[in-house]
């Protein structure tokens, strides 16, 4: 395997040379014998900031590939007492050995095992699950392997089922009814969290989001794991519900049950999806710590993008409602010219943009007030 040295953050690692695995002048990271995707640098950059605040004693990257993520955590975030890197691909495990040595890390434990098998053998304070596709096969094992009040980080790239484009796949993987709705970018993340909560409950544990976001073609989610059947029951009863959207007028709301429900505005039957998580997507105290800290990482290649994302999330995090997609709402209302988002925010007074969609707004003001602004500004 021909290797190429690359720099990401403050580390230098060897990866398969893309030129050796091109097909008709094109390259996909999955074609190489060991997976490395430079498009996920933003994901890793933000994760470096998160881990720097958590300072876990044990870090476990269960699906390490080149080892880039765990190595960056150790070098840039926090020199943990123990760094555990694993990949079931023996070629990847060998490459991890090279990359760990290349970055002067002496206390790393490297495994060449199936991720689930390893997760049922050991415990960790911080576990990272960054699979190719859905994290569902690793939810139970990662929650089980996390110590009390530990953290699990999940990446999900299978947006088709989560956003309602592939309904049967969503039902099969996430045990949720789904449709493509106006706010599906956010609802997909809530379906994912709902699935994790239900899986954790089978172990008499529960999870709460610490920080989460949507970017490019994936969701990234950090959850804190708590033990106790009572806590699991409370979280399910309080934070797992359904979501309804009116296909005629665009009114949307959380609903308690998956049953035929009429829109209170126009009387049309709701399209209902779920179950999904209805609580906050971030821990506000932790979010504040991220905002206070990220400037220390101005060397990151995606620093400006991180700054923009955190600025938007800081503003939208205080609102409890799912965002309204003004473009989709205007279409349902037969409003031909979509008003500028900034004008709608000014009209509403208490509202913000959302990172989920460029034409989305988040506010706790009522549907009627949003409609008034949309129509008055056309």
Curated annotation (Swiss-Prot):
Q: Which UniProt keywords apply?
A: Metal-binding, Methyltransferase, RNA-binding, S-adenosyl-L-methionine, Transferase, tRNA processing, tRNA-binding, Zinc
Q: Which Gene3D superfamilies has this protein been placed in?
A: N2,N2-dimethylguanosine tRNA methyltransferase, C-terminal domain, Vaccinia Virus protein VP39
Q: Where is the Trm1 methyltransferase domain?
A: 4-374
Q: What is its EC number?
A: 2.1.1.216
A Gene Ontology molecular function term for this protein is: tRNA binding
Q: Which residues hold S-adenosyl-L-methionine?
A: 44, 69, 87, 114-115
| Top-level taxonomic group | Archaea
Stated family: Belongs to the class I-like SAM-binding methyltransferase superfamily. Trm1 family.
- What is its biological role? Dimethylates a single guanine residue at position 26 of a number of tRNAs using S-adenosyl-L-methionine as donor of the methyl groups.
PANTHER family per the record? N 2 ,N 2 -DIMETHYLGUANOSINE TRNA METHYLTRANSFERASE, TRNA (GUANINE(26)-N(2))-DIMETHYLTRANSFERASE
Protein name as annotated = tRNA (guanine(26)-N(2))-dimethyltransferase
The organism's lineage?
Archaea, Thermoproteota, Thermoprotei, Sulfolobales, Sulfolobaceae
Gene for this chain: trm1
